[in-house]
Amino acid sequence: MIILPAIDLRMGKCVRLYKGDFNKTEIVAESAVDTALMFKECGAEYIHIVDLDGALKGKGINLDIVCELIKKVDIPIEFGGGIRDIETIDYLIDIGVSRIILGTAALNNEKLVREAIKRYDDKVAVGIDAKNGYVAVEGWLNLSNVNYIDFAKKMESIGVKNIIFTDISRDGTLNGPNFDALLKLKENINCNITASGGIKDVNDIKKLKEFNIYGAIVGKAIYSNNIDLKEAIKLSEK
């Protein structure tokens, strides 16, 4: 299992949200580049980055920071937030993003997912952000009537190999992941599943590893010192 430390960008700074609420934003670091360098020093092999401004506006807002980070940190990153067209995907892959994450666009534009998969195969992941079992879109502001399992099956059927699952009600809470929802997802699809939202300590990491989950995205637990990143990475590699 791999540990992906998380950087959420808002107005150029690293922030954390609470349950996806943009009115409950906490700045956790001024510099995304310095934060990423710290993650790399701790042994991170991959970093998860979300452009929250982009997710809200439907277009990349913090791409200059992403570009700088790729040049200075030299570590694989997966990036999502505001990716709505193939031109943006082409640009991100071109500047060195290792994996792009489609969220809202995946639900609203299946044709885009198919084209992205055709061009970039497993460099494309679909982020499924769910609340009460239903997929949320537009920066988590709107809840669809699409069940998260049905959506995951659909994405797998068109060639998606990587699914990032977030339970919005757990995000930023340090209450632990939604293990039941993750297990149900794992029982229904064969994609690589990355768990996100609520991971609070190394016990959660151990349990996810027991579930044979592909990856764990850890954010608030690192910034609040609940998890020692070096320790979590060593644990995940055992």
Swiss-Prot record:
Keywords: Amino-acid biosynthesis, Cytoplasm, Histidine biosynthesis, Isomerase. One of its GO terms (cellular component) is cytoplasm. GO terms for molecular function: 1-(5-phosphoribosyl)-5-[(5-phosphoribosylamino)methylideneamino]imidazole-4-carboxamide isomerase activity. Its EC number is 5.3.1.16. Gene3D superfamilies: Aldolase class I. It catalyses: 1-(5-phospho-beta-D-ribosyl)-5-[(5-phospho-beta-D-ribosylamino)methylideneamino]imidazole-4-carboxamide = 5-[(5-phospho-1-deoxy-D-ribulos-1-ylimino)methylamino]-1-(5-phospho-beta-D-ribosyl)imidazole-4-carboxamide. SUPFAM superfamilies: Ribulose-phoshate binding barrel (SSF51366). Transmembrane segments: none annotated. The keyword Hydrolase does not apply. Pathway: Amino-acid biosynthesis; L-histidine biosynthesis; L-histidine from 5-phospho-alpha-D-ribose 1-diphosphate: step 4/9. Belongs to the HisA/HisF family. PANTHER family: 1-(5-PHOSPHORIBOSYL)-5-[(5-PHOSPHORIBOSYLAMINO)METHYLIDENEAMINO] IMIDAZOLE-4-CARBOXAMIDE ISOMERASE. This is 1-(5-phosphoribosyl)-5-[(5-phosphoribosylamino)methylideneamino] imidazole-4-carboxamide isomerase. It comes from Clostridium novyi (strain NT). The gene is hisA.
